[in-house]
A protein has these predicted regions:
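Hydrophobic alpha-helical context, especially transmembrane and signal-peptide helices
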Residues: 2, 17-20, 34, 68
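Exported/periplasmic ABC-transporter solute-binding proteins
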Residues: 32-275
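N-terminal secretory signal peptides that target proteins for export/translocation
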Residues: 1-14
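Feature targets compositionally biased, intrinsically disordered low-complexity regions
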Residues: 7-10, 28, 33-36
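Bacterial N-terminal signal peptides
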Residues: 16-29
């Protein structure tokens, strides 16, 4: 479900929605708990499609195991791992919160955060200062940053999103403009920007396609090479978060993701390796 309304209104709905999602994951986890080979993941919607592919690959190679993946956002991934609703929480955060300190954090991939506009937009480069100005609401018209005159449609993620948390942390913490359109996944951000010539958004580098245009940030393109080199400024790790005690099936899946086949799959889909 896309949340097409300002941040203030979306914020009031976030907590109940997150509680519902945790309950759903808890039910799934309980249903699977009796199966020795069941592995449940929940959290980051940025990593969710990649995790689903990894799960499919692992399930095919290990029919005795059933790996299931749910989204919900990084905040939910942390809470699900803490309360046992999921064996593996997924989070894409530059900084893990204090409540995750009791969890084992394993980096399984790295990802750039691409800043994207509609392909017809003539703007192809922004500085970090300009980008923050747009998301704070100080810069409201494309003509002020080299584009054609017209209001900027600011597209952001919901408050529990790891992509949003990382984006705001790297730019320097700020209060998001209340005019922003809030979306609940990378995919809906992509579709919104693809369908609005005046929009700007941010999403996982691995999900950029021909429907949108990734722009340079501080003069650096968002490419695999420049992300790996450390020159591109908007980069975050992808974590698997677990309790100390893991089932053999969960440990086997994590080992697969960190191994040559899993890392090759991650890279083939546009993300960066863990190391």
């Amino acid at each position: 479900m896309s949340l097409l309304f300002p941040e203030g209104r979306a914020g009031r709905l976030c907590a109940p929605a997150q509680i519902l999602a945790v309950c759903v994951i808890s039910v799934i986890g309980a249903a699977c708990s009796g199966r020795e080979g069941a592995v449940t993941l929940a959290g980051s919607t940025a990593f969710q499609p990649f995790a689903e592919k990894l799960a499919e690959e692992y399930n095919d190679a290990h029919p005795e195991v059933n790996v299931t993946v749910q989204g919900g956002g990084s905040a939910l991934g942390i809470s699900a791992a803490l309360n046992g609703a999921a064996q593996i929480g997924m989070a894409d955060l530059v900084e893990l919160p204090a409540d995750a300190a009791s969890l084992k954090a394993t980096i399984v991939a790295r990802d750039g955060i691409a800043v994207v506009v509609n392909p017809v937009n003539k703007v192809s480069s922004l500085s970090m200062v300009q980008l923050k100005g747009i998301y704070v609401g100080n810069i409201r018209d494309w003509k002020d940053i080299g584009g054609l005159a017209g209001p900027i449609t600011v597209v952001s993620r919901e408050s529990g999103s790891g992509t949003r948390s990382s984006f705001e942390t790297i730019l320097g913490k700020f209060d998001l403009t209340r005019d922003a359109i809030i979306q609940d996944s990378n995919g809906t951000v992509r579709e919104t920007v693809a369908n609005d010539e005046r929009s700007i958004g941010y999403l996982s580098y691995g999900l950029v396609n021909q429907k949108i245009k990734a722009i340079t940030v501080d003069g650096v393109e968002c490419t695999t090479e420049l992300i790996l080199s450390g020159k591109y400024p908007l980069v975050r790790p992808i974590y698997f978060l677990t309790l100390d005690k893991l089932s053999p099936a969960a440990r086997g899946f994590i080992d697969y993701v960190l191994g040559p086949a899993g890392q090759a799959s991650i890279v083939a889909d546009g993300l960066l390796p863990a190391k």
